[in-house]
Amino acid sequence: MNIAVLGAGAWGTALAICLSARHRVTLWTRNVEHLAELAALRTNQRYLPRQPLPDSIHLVSALSEALERAELVFVVVPVAGLRTTLQQMVALNPSLPLILACKGFETGSAKLPCQVVEEVYPASITCGVLSGPSFAREVAQGLPAALTLASHDEIFARSVAGEIRTASLRVYSGNDVIGVEVGGALKNVIAIAAGISDGIAFGNNARAALITRGLAEITRLGMALGGCRETFTGLTGIGDLILTCTGNLSRNRRVGMMLAAGRQLAEILPEIGHVTEGVYTVREAYGLGQRLQIDMPVTQAVYSILYEQVPVEIAIQDMLDREPGAETD
């Protein structure tokens, strides 16, 4: 199969490497300088250093060239640039099947990636979302991982899941597109909180409590938006949440740890050098929670630290001072 992967960040590069084992892959980046580096070094020194890029992967910077022979497209651009990329794509080929592999809410509209597709593409478009616990470096290295591919077209989801699985990558299929995307977006917010907790050395008990109560927030918001409860106990819910809140490769957890050390966001983000979606997702998630009247104390605490300049210690104390209710509320 001819597959185009749009976005040459860490995750896009890892997917391209993984998919190239069974398919003809074209990797697209709009950055001409980055393309030249990829071609010269055959590694993504900016985002996935020391990981060889197979010679079979075709590199392009023209979107028209990336889509020319593609039978399937993986869209792996940051959510901030998703709508613009989709608008360019639909003008070139409005019927090419899409797989969204980006996580977050669109800034300003609070739309999920699948909802942005619905606004840009004809209703007939075949679209799926790919998510789950997966650090890019480990996937690129061929270490075992499991993901979920969800689509309203369940036949399409099963077909693509079978096409992209490898000896080390297990891909399940499903139909809860909203639930999968909410889990993938909000886990980054909870991971910032977990990083703050770890940075302050609150210990394992506190981290476990944060993950568990964070999952409750994800589930409440996800169900309010139309997701299924069962999804949040699966790979794209608790699975992705555990990984992002505990793994040392988690950029969002790292942001939290640096905040706990007294660092300012303005200096943290350039140092990390990658898009850290949780920083932007928390604004939209907090706004959604307010509008839908959903209790989201962990999200609120992260929002207050990042955007209301509330000191970390005060935000934590405010959480601890909350009157506990029934666990299942």
From Swiss-Prot:
This protein's pathway reads: Membrane lipid metabolism; glycerophospholipid metabolism
For this UniProt record, give its keywords in alphabetical order, as a comma-separated list: Cytoplasm, Lipid biosynthesis, Lipid metabolism, NAD, NADP, Nucleotide-binding, Oxidoreductase, Phospholipid biosynthesis, Phospholipid metabolism
User: Among the entry's GO cellular component annotations, what is one?
Assistant: cytosol
Q: What class of enzyme is it?
A: oxidoreductase
Name the NCBIfam families for this protein. Answer: PRK00094.1-2, PRK00094.1-4
Query: To which protein family does this belong?
Result: Belongs to the NAD-dependent glycerol-3-phosphate dehydrogenase family.
The molecule here is called Glycerol-3-phosphate dehydrogenase [NAD(P)+]
Native source organism of the sequence: Nitrosomonas europaea (strain ATCC 19718 / CIP 103999 / KCTC 2705 / NBRC 14298)
Identify the gene encoding this protein: gpsA
